[in-house]
Amino acid sequence: MKLADALSLIRDIPDYPRPGILFKDITPLLANPTAYSTVIKAFATQIDDVDVIAGIEARGFIFAAAIALEKNAGFVPFRKSGKLPFETIGAKYGLEYGEDEIEVHIDAFANGKSVVIVDDVLATGGTITAALELAERSGAVVKSVHVLFEISGLGGREVIAKRFPNVEIKSLVTS
């Protein structure tokens, strides 16, 4: 299956989860094993050898764990605050109406492991910037960030580039 055919299975849901938002529903793509595999392989071809693929909760997990298997790499989750059982470090990021926080185990990236960070969407850049900060504080060497969608009009790429100018950002779809 061609990547464009796989991506065509993603449907737009207007006004979800609130008015003015165009939500990208990936469930039809995930339900089709050929399409899902095509997307995972497309991500994997963009990534050189790496120790760890790190995914951001929640939809980033769906892609990151599968990419990690494809690349014979470990998987590390960035979780919402309070969801990890061991000692963690956290980073806050801004939301439209307040703040949220993601965490990672304090030993997730020990010994300067090379890391690729994966999420479903790059919008404002807040969540990915928080993940990059945590990886940096943990001693990881971040090679790149990979997303399924990039919403270019929201400035996320620029936010990340300002704080992390040497981190490459790759997206399969840009709108």
Model-derived features: positions:
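PRPP-associated nucleotide enzymes
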Residues: M1-S175
